[in-house]
Every structure is written in structure tokens, then in C-alpha cells.
Amino acid sequence: MKGFVVISRFILTLFILITPGLAGVVNYAENSEWNVPKYGNVLDSNCQGQKPVTFFGSVTEHVSNSWWIKLYDYMMTFISGEKLCMQNVAYEFEDISLCMDVVGSKCIPTLQSTDIEKVVNSTSAYLENSESDLTLGCFQIQRFQEESTLYIRALKSSEPVSCDTVRCIHFNHIPYV
């Protein structure tokens, strides 16, 4: 009987010690879209393993139906069915929070910089306002190069845009031109 009491106390102590840690894990999982590090990995089982996620960017212009997203020497990793968020990642520009939902059915291998234009110009994605959680609809992603700066424009189409052209796009390190 005494042994049973000792074991019970031991199990209770373990439970008390472990529970806060488990709560932290659950909390992180629930809010993981806001805690994606600037440097890190997101598991993508559809595209063979972990892919680097590095966010450098800012919204430089906002008009009624489009955003100009200024990206630096790293691009975002888009994973179908996942929501990847950039939060407070701007440098000399205004801090932003931007979410992208990527949908589709085809996985494109890691791209070289010479392949970006033709792929991005045929890529659709969802843009979402992270603060109001308002889905803005299907956007056509367009690429624009100006000297050493790469811009991607997400322009809301007046016509329905097919959002199943790609499953995922991985933009690895893009050297400055």
C-alpha cells in the first residue's frame, strides 16, 4: 500500500511538471502561423521534406485591388494548403502582417532565378488580411524586376482566376542581379 502511495505521488508530480510544457506546445501549435521564424523550416510532406522559410519583405504600395510586395534576396516558400504569414518583418518600411493561402495540385521543384518569371506569371494564390481575417479572393501573382530589387505584385482579377495551377513553389536564394 505504501508503495502504491509513493508511485501515485510520483505520477502526480510528473503530471504537474509536464502539464505547463504541454500547454505551451499546444499554444504554439494553435498560433504557429504567427510564430513562423524568419529562419526556419516548415514540413511539407507533399514536396519531399522540410523546406527553408525565410521572410524578407514589405508592402510598399496598397491600392484598392493590389499589393506590391517588395522582397529581398530570399523568397517565401509557398506550400499548398498551408497558410504562411509574414509578421513584422519589414526593415525600413512599415511593419506588416500578411497571410497567403496557396492552393493547387502540382508541385514545382526548387526554382532557379531564370525560371521565376514564367512560373510566377502563371501562379495564382489567395491573399488574406491577417487582422480582419477577410479573404480577399483569388489573386494573380506577377513578377517585376527593377535593378537589384525583385517585386511581386498580387493583383486581384476582375475575372475568376483558376487557383489550381500549382501545388507549391519554392523560391530559394535569389542572388542580386
UniProtKB/Swiss-Prot annotation:
Query: Where does the protein principally reside?
Result: endoplasmic reticulum
Q: Where in the cell is it found?
A: Endoplasmic reticulum; Golgi apparatus
A cellular component term (GO) from this record? endoplasmic reticulum
What is the annotated signal peptide range for this record? Answer: 1-23
Task: Answer whether the UniProt record assigns the keyword Protein transport to this protein.
Answer: no
Identify the keywords attached in UniProt to this record, alphabetized. Endoplasmic reticulum, Glycoprotein, Golgi apparatus, Signal
For whether the record's keyword set contains Disulfide bond, the answer is no
Q: Which residues are glycosylated?
A: 121
What does this protein do, in the record's words?
Answer: Has a role in meiosis.
This chain's protein is named Meiotically up-regulated gene 121 protein
Its taxonomic placement starts with: Eukaryota, Fungi, Dikarya, Ascomycota, Taphrinomycotina
